[in-house]
UniProtKB/Swiss-Prot annotation:
This is Cobalt-precorrin-5B C(1)-methyltransferase. The keyword Methyltransferase applies. Signal peptide: none annotated. The gene is cbiD. Disulfide bonds: none annotated.
Length: 369
């Protein structure tokens, strides 16, 4: 069967740079501009349609509608606005200067570790450079130096940000202006791994030596409600919110990133089916191998002989959760799987001290060790 290729889109950073370039051109030429061509960081030339054009002698504004392609991006369809305001610079030998700020709907950085200074608008370095260079380029043909003030805004950015991990990363009040290539790859693992790296950078900058890596929000909440300390549930110093990092299905990447960034201790948190996949050696737990995982689990339980808490035949089991429930949450059974998950994780990142927390489907802690 032929499947239609997924369509790529463009980052908020590329859209912001295009809008700023369009506004700058309107301000310089004092006429409406319908479209601008932007050169992305890897050299690709892309045309962006402009909307909402307004201008007078001192300022101009417009917006680009974010197109994320076939990626399920919450910012798809968002209006990325830019306003460029100018002041004459009456100094001999002076050069045109560009200052970029965030307006309504663009978040503010409140925690270290993100590559953007605390207190600054959440506009990442590559988009910041694209915006600055694009505006300067438009005014490079003007003899009189200018001071140009660029404001990037997203009208519904604060509401959209609630659907992202921005608050956890310490970005408050709106969205981030992101992108290193200008292109959004559809359903890309890179979006997850970029967020993982950012969350770990924030955690390390905040002094966290113990990181809680969870496979999802449900299991993470179990760990939070259990009062995870640096030595486990209800023990030691309570961990700050920055220590909690959702790795999703990217266990291998997350563990190696922790090791690379100097993390010392990791608490791996997940529900039974995900921990079973880790125990079976999967670095990416989204893989469709449930049947093979259950076969491996059957072999492990066979080694227990008469002590096995799971009645046969195995052909009647369809899911890992069903097996756990049939065992009656047997402690020996849970320890078997969690120990193997911990050992598999340690093989992926030998420098880390790793412990495993099994989150029950009823939101309780079933195992820690």
């Amino acid at each position: 069967m032929n499947t239609k290729p997924l369509r790529h889109g463009y980052t908020t950073g590329a859209c912001a740079a295009a809008a700023a370039k369009g506004a700058a051109r309107m301000l310089r030429e004092q006429r409406p501009v319908e479209e601008v061509e932007l050169v992305l960081p890897k050299g690709e030339r892309v045309a962006f349609r402009l909307h909402g054009q307004e201008f007078d002698d001192s300022a101009a504004s417009c917006f680009v509608v974010k197109d994320a392609g076939d990626d399920p991006d919450v910012t798809n369809g968002a209006e990325i606005h830019a306003r460029v305001r100018r002041e004459p610079l009456n100094r001999s030998g002076a050069r045109t200067m560009v200052f970029v700020d965030g307006g309504k709907g663009v978040g503010t950085v409140t925690k270290p570790g993100l590559g953007v200074g605390v207190g600054n608008p959440a506009i990442n370095p590559v988009p910041m450079r694209m915006i600055t260079e694009g505006v300067k380029e438009e005014f490079s043909v003007v003899c009189l130096p200018q001071v140009l003030h660029v404001t990037i805004s997203i009208p519904n950015g604060e509401e959209l940000a609630k659907k992202t991990l921005n608050a956890r990363l310490g970005i408050v009040g709106g969205l981030s202006i992101l992108g290193t290539t200008g292109i959004v790859r559809p359903i890309s693992a890179k979006a997850w791994t970029d967020t993982l790296d950012a969350a770990l950078d924030v955690a390390r900058a905040c002094g966290c030596e113990t990181i809680v890596l969870s496979t999802g929000r449900t299991s993470e909440l179990v760990a939070i409600h259990a009062g995870i300390g640096d030595r486990g549930p209800g023990t030691g110093k309570t961990l700050p919110e920055e220590a909690y990092v959702m790795m999703g299905d990217h266990v291998g990447y997350a563990l190696r990133a922790c090791a690379r960034k100097g993390v010392r201790h990791v608490i791996l948190v997940g529900q039974f089916a995900k921990l079973l996949k880790i125990a079976c050696g999967h670095e990416q737990t989204h893989v469709s191998s449930s049947e093979l995982d259950l076969q491996m689990l059957a072999e492990w339980l066979h080694e227990l002989g008469s002590r096995s808490p799971v009645p046969g035949p195995w052909s009647r089991y369809n899911t890992a959760r069903q097996v756990l429930e049939e065992s009656g949450n047997d402690s020996l059974f849970m320890e078997l799987v969690c120990t193997r998950a911990r050992d598999a994780a340690r093989r992926l990142a030998p420098s880390l001290d790793i412990k495993v927390l099994l989150a029950g489907y009823d939101s309780t802690v079933l195992y820690f060790g």
